[in-house]
């Protein structure tokens, strides 16, 4: 294939311009210059359009639905390194580790969102389809980092179900239709229904999103490879709200090696703010674009935290550590977050809490405060929130 053939394959360039610009040995003079100019113009148009396309990389459907970001926010996430997208033709290069095929099913990495605390990895699955409304299942083996032990607090995964949350808080499929109701299989389950998802995308593929929370939050996880081992695909039958049957329909081996490229962007503040309870202070707040960590110091240390006689006292103290609800920006906007885990460090006499965003990303240059809710006394009224300034 020569340069002329490549340009013809780009449908947005008029083939007539390409033919007119082709070298013609018998022609001389100014007309030949015109042909060269047309060829240069065609190439310039190609580069301009390709550059513009790169600035607006298509995000995965699941992350688009979860975060509902503006184009500017997506562009900032890409420029900072928080978001990395993998076009299908790139992921499926032989021996890249970004794609695997077995039993007619291909699994490829589509997009990652990674900061110092956590990672979201979106996989595209081609060749495995289920009827609409049937919840897919993936059997995932042990996850390792660079072939070694997984260092994290946990991992969860879910398939994109095609159900969106509208501005008024109601639900709809992507085409605007209200979602169809499903019913749990156990007759004695009190819950009436759930919503049936549309898991097949227009091209017939599915998306599976995996979320990892790192144990080491100093950035040492970035740059490593996460080895993922999938051993089967099937379906899930929901029997109750937290009770389901998983059936593997296709067994195989899909091994991926996913580079943890992300951002170390972080702000760390030391508010030393005494909370209303009077015996707990927020000492340190470290915040990244999509997750972060907080340290609360107790006035009186808890002794023997793991002993049965002090378990009740420890649980009571945990209930008194407020729940983080949002990161507040300088313009008054609240970015909703939720705490993912809470643990006591006896040697430091502090509780450590990690949190993640639930929508949108955090503009670190605009952070002004943290919003907390008392776990025991929260009334649901904004005026009862605990506001901790950190700017």
PLM region descriptions:
Residues 1-33:
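Disordered, charged N-terminal biogenesis/targeting segments of membrane/secreted proteins
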Residues 3, 17-25, 38-39, 43-50, ...:
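Generic ordered-secondary-structure signal
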Residues 8, 38-40, 162, 197:
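Generic secretory/membrane-interface signal
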Residues 10, 35-71:
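Single-pass transmembrane signal-anchor helices and their membrane-water interface zones
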Residues 26-30, 54, 129:
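Solvent-exposed, non-transmembrane amphipathic alpha-helical segments
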Residues 55-391:
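Alpha-helical, hydrophobic structural elements that either
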């Amino acid at each position: 294939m020569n340069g002329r053939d490549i340009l013809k394959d780009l449908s947005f360039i008029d083939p007539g311009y390409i033919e007119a610009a082709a070298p013609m040995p018998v022609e001389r003079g100014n007309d030949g210059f015109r042909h060269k100019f047309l060829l240069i113009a065609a190439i310039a148009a190609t580069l301009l359009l390709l550059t513009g396309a790169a600035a607006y990389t298509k995000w995965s459907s699941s992350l688009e639905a979860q975060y509902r970001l503006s184009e500017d926010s997506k562009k900032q996430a890409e420029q900072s390194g928080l978001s990395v997208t993998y076009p299908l033709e790139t992921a499926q290069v032989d021996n890249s580790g970004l794609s695997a095929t077995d039993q007619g099913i291909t699994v490829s990495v589509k997009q990652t969102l990674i900061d110092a605390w956590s990672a979201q990895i979106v996989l595209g699955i081609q060749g495995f389809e289920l009827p609409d409304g049937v919840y897919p299942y993936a059997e995932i083996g042990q996850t390792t980092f660079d072939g070694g032990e997984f260092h994290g607090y946990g991992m969860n995964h879910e398939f994109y179900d095609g159900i969106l949350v509208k501005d008024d808080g109601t639900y709809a499929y992507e085409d605007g239709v209200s979602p169809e109701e499903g019913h749990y299989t156990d007759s004695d389950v009190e819950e009436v229904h759930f919503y049936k998802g549309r898991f097949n995308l227009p091209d017939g593929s599915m998306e599976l999103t995996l979320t990892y929370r790192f144990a080491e939050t100093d950035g040492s996880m970035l740059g490593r490879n996460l080895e993922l081992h999938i051993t089967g695909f099937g379906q899930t039958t929901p029997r109750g709200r937290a009770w389901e049957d998983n059936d593997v329909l296709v067994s195989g081996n899909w091994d991926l090696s996913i580079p943890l490229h992300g951002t170390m962007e972080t702000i760390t503040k030391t508010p030393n703010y005494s909370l209303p309870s009077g015996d707990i202070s927020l000492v340190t707040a470290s915040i990244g674009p999509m997750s972060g960590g907080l340290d609360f110091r107790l006035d009186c240390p808890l002794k023997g935290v793991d002993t049965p006689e002090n378990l009740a006292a420890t649980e009571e103290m945990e209930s008194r550590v407020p729940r983080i609800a949002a990161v507040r920006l300088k313009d008054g906007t609240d970015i909703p977050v939720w705490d993912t885990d809470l643990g006591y460090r006896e040697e430091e006499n502090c509780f450590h809490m990690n949190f993640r965003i639930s929508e949108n990303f955090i503009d670190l240059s605009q952070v002004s405060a943290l919003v907390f809710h008392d776990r025991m006394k929260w009334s649901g009224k904004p005026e009862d929130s605990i506001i901790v300034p950190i700017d």
